[in-house]
Amino acid sequence: MLIDGLTVNTCPVGASDGVTLRNVKSISHPGWGDGLNVFASQNVLYDRVFCRNSDDCTTAYASRKGFFGNCRNVTMRNATLWADVAHPIFIGIHGNAERGDTIENLHYENIDILGQAEPQVDYQGCLAINCGDNNLVRNVTFDNIRIEQIEQGSILQVKVGYNQKYCTAPGRGVENVTFRNIRYKGHQPYLSIVNGYSEERKVKGVTFEGIKINGRLLHDKMEGKPAWYATADYIPMYVGNHVENIGFSIP
């Protein structure tokens, strides 16, 4: 299915296979005004889309709102996202907690994020994975993303957690996440977070390649960084418990 050239309020994709949205604009103002949501679908492509939303701009969830199953093979490219509150990109919080769903193979490329203004710490992160409901989130790539001024919020969050307001179980884990060529220019954002839940529900394998904060390229051997400082401090980012294999490099 191809949807081309429409201007919509919200436009969710649920229980679908093989959907392309091209040249679509999503503009919303009410509460819960998410833009382009994906529920329990696969092989979904967003190309040349614009989102100006009063809640999350785009999401990738598993079972939710009467749609049941895994979510995989979702790509968004050549996009502009602007969230009033909540997240420009949000992944992972909803699924079937009894069965345990999988959200995998997500790719976000060549995206401009114009802002985030979210005062609630647990819902910050322009690039956010909040894994709940016994979901497993894996193989996620954020590539060539430019973030402008953040009014309130952080650059990223990658968490396995148990948000009892919206979930009935913690997530199973997050694996293999790549942040490549991410650029932020503005005043210092709030603290980014990478954090697992337990020894059985970890964050594993988070790679940062070519990250620039206000023009400074961050990597583990960058000039001027004391050897005892964590590279994550320069985002700034807190790396918490139950996190394995996190590293910064030059692509």
Annotate the PLM regions.
Residues 1-251:
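Extracellular/periplasmic carbohydrate-active domains that bind, remodel
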